[in-house]
Amino acid sequence: LLEDAEITVEEQLERLERRVEEFVACIRGLPDRQFLAKMNGWSPRDVVAHLIGWSTYTIEGCEEMRRGERPSYLSDWRVDFQNINAVSVQRFCSEDKQELLDELAASLEVLKQYLRSIPREEWASNPGVNYLGYRITVQNSIEGLTGDYAHHTRQVEEWVASLK
């Protein structure tokens, strides 16, 4: 997790945006049949739905942290967030690639607006919220989301390469 207290909110959002752009380009390049095909139990469509959900979960979690509460999504950590991810896959159920990518873009805009509203001094602060020995902050939560986009981009790219 990121512990660079000198990074600005805008620099971290730029990192997130780069990873999102890479992910979106990867998904856009998929034929519809691959977009809906299962890979490792999920389809690329499911991954997009999962990431749409995480924009909302991140906002909710940051609000909880700022109140000194543990983010509620962490209650699903031990099962690798399977329950909340399943909710997102069902909630964002379209099979239309462009529709889901538009929802992803909209969810990210809401997330970025929210993050820009957080005072800088709260970005890396920890109001006593720890989980499994880690300090949880807005900053490292966003770094985790950024890493999730990179992970899923690699996952889809490796899956596509394995089909050749």
Regions found by a protein language model. Give the residues of each.
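Short amphipathic alpha-helical segments with heptad-repeat character
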Residues: 10-17, 48, 52, 98-101, ...
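Long, hydrophobic N-terminal alpha-helical segment
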Residues: 15-44
